[in-house]
């Protein structure tokens, strides 16, 4: 049985986050998703479509960015960034999902917002994003997260988790899928274990054989 577990960051409340001193930076990101009744190849349930994006640095993340609390509320700052990368969406405090403290030398609190759209609305966001100011610059394109696992137990979500993610994005994705009941925790653990094993094997192939 796999010993892999869903990684977790230190969660704090929104009120606690707002009380943090000026030495802390605030990042705000949005997870947009929609129920998807479709089937891949006519047999693999899609279940949900979740949007992430490929960034300028080659890392995957959610739409959003840093918010200067001296000039903007969390939501106003987030909407300003979303306007540059998506072009046609405004989130509110009602969409707030969580705040987590990041690990490492930089003092950053990461806020995540989540909004469920219809599949048609989600597709409209994808179309609008192509015409946004940051498309092809800071944002290289939106991607849908494959929330299924194929028969080989690697294709789909495990392969997706093998990609490189920016900062807290991977942990935020797993957290949101869990708390929004979009994927059972045991399925998250299985996908993580498969992704870790794949990465381990890939690394072993790159390393020279020991003499």
UniProtKB/Swiss-Prot annotation:
<dbReference type="Pfam" id="PF22327">
    <property type="entry name" value="Nudt16-like"/>
</dbReference>
<keyword id="KW-0539">Nucleus</keyword>
<dbReference type="GO" id="GO:2001033">
    <property type="term" value="P:negative regulation of double-strand break repair via nonhomologous end joining"/>
</dbReference>
<dbReference type="GO" id="GO:0003723">
    <property type="term" value="F:RNA binding"/>
</dbReference>
<feature type="cross-link" description="Glycyl lysine isopeptide (Lys-Gly) (interchain with G-Cter in ubiquitin)">
    <location>
        <position position="10"/>
    </location>
</feature>
<feature type="cross-link" description="Glycyl lysine isopeptide (Lys-Gly) (interchain with G-Cter in ubiquitin)">
    <location>
        <position position="151"/>
    </location>
</feature>
<feature type="site" description="Required for interaction with TP53BP1">
    <location>
        <position position="10"/>
    </location>
</feature>
<keyword id="KW-0694">RNA-binding</keyword>
<protein>
    <recommendedName>
        <fullName>Tudor-interacting repair regulator protein</fullName>
    </recommendedName>
</protein>
<keyword id="KW-0832">Ubl conjugation</keyword>
<dbReference type="GO" id="GO:0005634">
    <property type="term" value="C:nucleus"/>
</dbReference>
<dbReference type="GO" id="GO:0030515">
    <property type="term" value="F:snoRNA binding"/>
</dbReference>
<comment type="subunit">
    <text>Homodimer. Interacts with TP53BP1 (via the Tudor-like domain); interaction is abolished following DNA damage and TP53BP1 phosphorylation by ATM. Interacts (via the cytoplasmic part) with SDC4. Interacts with TGFB1I1 and PXN.</text>
</comment>
<comment type="similarity">
    <text>Belongs to the Nudix hydrolase family. TIRR subfamily.</text>
</comment>
<feature type="region of interest" description="Interaction with PXN">
    <location>
        <begin position="118"/>
        <end position="205"/>
    </location>
</feature>
<keyword id="KW-1017">Isopeptide bond</keyword>
<dbReference type="InterPro" id="IPR015797">
    <property type="entry name" value="NUDIX_hydrolase-like_dom_sf"/>
</dbReference>
<dbReference type="InterPro" id="IPR054754">
    <property type="entry name" value="NudT16"/>
</dbReference>
<comment type="function">
    <text>Key regulator of TP53BP1 required to stabilize TP53BP1 and regulate its recruitment to chromatin. In absence of DNA damage, interacts with the tandem Tudor-like domain of TP53BP1, masking the region that binds histone H4 dimethylated at 'Lys-20' (H4K20me2), thereby preventing TP53BP1 recruitment to chromatin and maintaining TP53BP1 localization to the nucleus.</text>
</comment>
């Amino acid at each position: 049985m796999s010993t892999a577990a869903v990684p977790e960051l230190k969660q704090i409340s929104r009120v606690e986050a707002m009380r943090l001193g000026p030495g802390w930076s605030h990042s705000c990101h949005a997870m947009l998703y929609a129920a998807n009744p479709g089937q891949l190849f006519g047999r693999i349930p899609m279940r949900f479509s979740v949007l992430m994006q490929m960034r300028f640095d080659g890392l995957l993340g959610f739409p959003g960015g840093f918010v200067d609390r001296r000039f903007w509320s969390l939501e106003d700052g987030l909407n300003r960034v979303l306007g540059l990368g998506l072009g046609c969406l405004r989130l509110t405090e009602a969409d707030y999902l969580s705040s987590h403290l990041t690990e490492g030398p930089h003092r950053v609190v990461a806020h995540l917002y989540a909004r469920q759209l219809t599949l048609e609305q989600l597709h409209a966001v994808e179309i609008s994003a192509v015409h946004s100011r940051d498309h092809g610059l800071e944002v290289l394109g939106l991607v849908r997260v494959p929330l299924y696992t194929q028969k080989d137990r690697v294709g789909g979500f495990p392969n997706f988790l093998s990609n490189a993610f920016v900062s807290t994005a991977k942990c935020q994705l797993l957290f949101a899928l869990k708390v929004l009941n979009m994927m059972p925790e045991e399925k998250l653990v299985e996908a993580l274990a498969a992704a870790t094993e794949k990465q381990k094997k890939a690394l072993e192939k790159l390393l020279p054989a020991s003499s």
